[in-house]
Curated annotation (Swiss-Prot):
Gene that this sequence comes from: dpy-31
Organism name: Teladorsagia circumcincta (Brown stomach worm)
Glycosylation sites recorded in the entry for this protein: N190, N461
Function: Metalloprotease which cleaves the carboxyl terminus of procollagens to mature collagens. Probably involved in cuticular collagen maturation.
Protein biosynthesis found in the keyword field: no
Enzyme Commission identifier(s): 3.4.24.-
Name the UniProt record assigns to this protein: Zinc metalloproteinase dpy-31
């Protein structure tokens, strides 16, 4: 089994369970993972308490903390004013305590997405005062939050990919918890060009310090003034998927569902959102987005779940426009392929001098420039092969025709085993499409209360297999009849947590002789210049199967940006507070100035013939 595939599986691990494939996995210090996670006497010792005041405030001073929460409270008020749906000012319940208990797992008693329960921006994001002020002021003016998403845009907050990222621990984690955190860092190392080095003696310069003083929480991106930044991982956060989520914040990721194009993919149910949380769902300014051309991703580890910040247990706050994607959003098992692709586009695009002819949505691997990094389900130097089964003989390439071809989970109708994986590529003849239906009994482990798949069958039927597909789980046979957009359709069976009955399905080829209705008008472009925006249109197929997509997305407003842009500048200035009394001491200050735009095009685009092109 390849190291890449094995490390992908790592992120399904919760506090103590690890799949068998990684028991021989080695870290930089040469430790074997079976020794790596063994509890020692040190793990059973009480944690050393963290007493520094700034640790309690996650690196902020008392005054900074008050300023940030002043603007967060104003943002909360603004959200309730703009979206009064479902708000009852006469409600007298203690909703704060009830909300914190609400989404605990029925069976295992654990918080499914613990980062949502924090007291910070969007639950787990530590803002600096200037960020909080900017977010509120732009929301006040435009109804949107002016922040660069999905990836932070300021160069001051991006790490230097040519230098190792220093990290340390403040002593509040047990040695076992430290090992799990380092395993998550090792995963980021393996799938990007980024390197991490532990230095517990570092006392200056940019570095990440892991603590456990404030739930699950992190700043976004590198500290612009070259100081330490805290990533809080309390005991309930010590799961590899949650750790990867918080580390992604520290590396520059914001949350997925706040992208300005989100209304093309999900519907925010304002009437179902907790009255103190509506400010968390305002969108960003579309002219200030940096998604590096990576599309909206239902399967992103940075996406809220379906019932995030809901008033009551059974209310959806986010509904996907395509219903079959509903159980895809909110997963904290593993980084999606597009999460990894975006990180590599931002930090690693110049590592490999030659770009390989990768297939199936793959791209040149910055860790191995002679191979492609492939979407789940594919392998080979150029992603030309279907990934073989793991734990069972299953999967492969199936050529379908006009008759039904059946395939199923391992051993069906007997139960499959935990840890088994199968990948199928269903191929129809030229000019035809694949139709797939589930048949027979269906059982895959899910969190019913949270509307989230844990084990699943995923179907990718779009033109780009890099995008996360529709995930099916729980109990009862899905009634959906799925058709591919091209001659190919991908089906992934993944059992990370439990065994079960599994699934049986059938597939056949259909002539692509349906008739498309006219395209709808284009939606407004999400950005005004620089090929930074996208627009969408839809169409409906009738009288059979239609080749092609019912939805089309397009880069728009490709003319270069000009005029003035906001830039962050760091310069020496007068010190405040106690330091102002010291003669000759100068302090670094960051301020925003309007200057001619440096980047006429979004990352990944350049000016050719007066237009921004890839």
């Amino acid at each position: 089994m390849s190291l890449l595939r094995c490390t992908t599986l790592l992120l399904v691990v919760v506090a103590i369970a690890l799949p068998p494939c990684i028991l021989g996995y080695s870290l930089h210090d040469g430790s074997r993972l079976d020794d790596f996670l063994t509890e020692s006497a040190a793990d059973r010792r009480p944690r050393r308490p963290t007493t520094a005041a700034q640790r309690r405030l996650m690196g902020l001073t008392e005054e900074q903390y008050k300023t940030v929460h002043f603007y967060l409270n104003k943002l909360k008020e603004l959200g309730n004013q703009r979206h009064p749906e479902g708000y009852d000012k006469d409600t007298t319940k203690d909703e704060a305590d009830k909300w914190r208990k609400r989404m605990r797992d029925d069976i295992e008693g654990e918080l499914l997405n613990p980062e949502e329960y924090g007291r910070h921006f969007e639950g787990d994001i530590i803002l600096f005062p200037e960020q909080a002020k900017q977010i509120y002021e732009n929301a006040l003016k435009t109804g949107q939050r002016r922040v660069k998403r999905k990836f932070i845009g300021s160069d001051l907050r991006r790490w230097d990919p040519t230098r190792p990222i220093v990290y340390s621990f403040d002593g509040s984690h047990t040695s076992r918890e430290q090992r799990i955190i380092e395993l998550a860092l090792e995963h980021w190392h393996n799938i990007t060009c980024l390197n991490f080095v532990r230095n517990d003696n570092a006392n200056s310069g940019n570095r990440i310090v892991f603590t456990d003083v404030d739930g699950c929480a992190s700043n976004v991106g590198r500290h612009p003034l070259g100081e330490e930044q805290l990533v809080s991982l309390a005991p309930e956060c010590i799961r590899l998927g949650v750790i990867a989520h918080e580390v992604a914040h520290a590396l520059g990721f914001w949350h997925e569902q706040s992208r300005p194009d989100r209304d093309q993919f999900v519907n925010v149910r304002w009437e179902n959102i907790d009255k103190d949380s509506k400010g968390q769902f305002l969108k960003e300014d579309p002219d200030d987005v940096d998604n590096a051309g990576v599309p909206y991703d239902y399967g992103s580890i940075m996406h809220y779940r379906s019932k995030a910040f809901s008033r009551y247990d059974d209310l959806y706050t986010i509904s996907t426009f395509v219903t079959d994607y509903q159980k895809t959003i909110g997963q904290r098992d593993q980084l999606s392929f597009n999460d990894i692709r975006l990180m590599n586009k931002i930090y690693c695009s110049n590592v490999c001098s030659r770009k390989l002819p990768c297939q199936r949505g793959g791209y040149t691997d910055p860790r191995r420039c002679d191979r492609c990094r492939c979407p789940d389900g594919f392998t080979g130097q150029f992603c030309e092969q279907v990934m073989p089964g793991y734990g069972a003989v299953c999967g492969g390439r199936i050529q379908v025709n006009g008759g039904w071809t059946k395939f199923s989970s391992p051993g069906y109708p007997r139960e499959f085993k935990e840890g088994q994986e199968c990948s199928w590529l269903l191929v129809a003849p030229h000019g035809q499409v694949v139709e797939m239906q589930f048949i027979g009994e269906f059982e895959m482990y899910c969190k019913v209360r949270h509307s989230l798949c844990m084990d699943y069958v995923e179907v990718r039927n779009s033109t780009d297999f890099a995008n996360t597909g529709m995930r099916y789980c729980c109990y009862g046979t899905p009634s959906t009849s799925i058709r591919s957009a091209t001659t190919d359709l991908v089906v992934l069976f993944r059992s990370f947590y439990r065994g079960g009955r599994g699934f049986e399905a059938r597939a056949r080829a259909l002539p692509a002789n349906g008739q498309w209705a006219s395209w709808s008008p284009w939606t407004p472009c999400t950005a005004s210049c620089g090929a930074c925006g996208s627009r969408m249109r839809t169409r409906v197929c009738s009288h059979g199967a239609c080749a092609g997509e019912p939805v089309e997305n397009q880069v728009c407003n490709t003319h270069p940006c000009n005029g003035l842009c906001a830039h962050k500048k760091t310069e020496d200035g007068e010190c405040g507070g106690f330091l102002a009394l010291l003669r000759g001491v100068r302090c670094k200050q960051e301020r925003t100035v309007m200057e001619p735009c440096e980047n006429a095009c979004c990352p990944g685009f350049s000016v050719v013939g007066g237009r921004c092109v890839r």
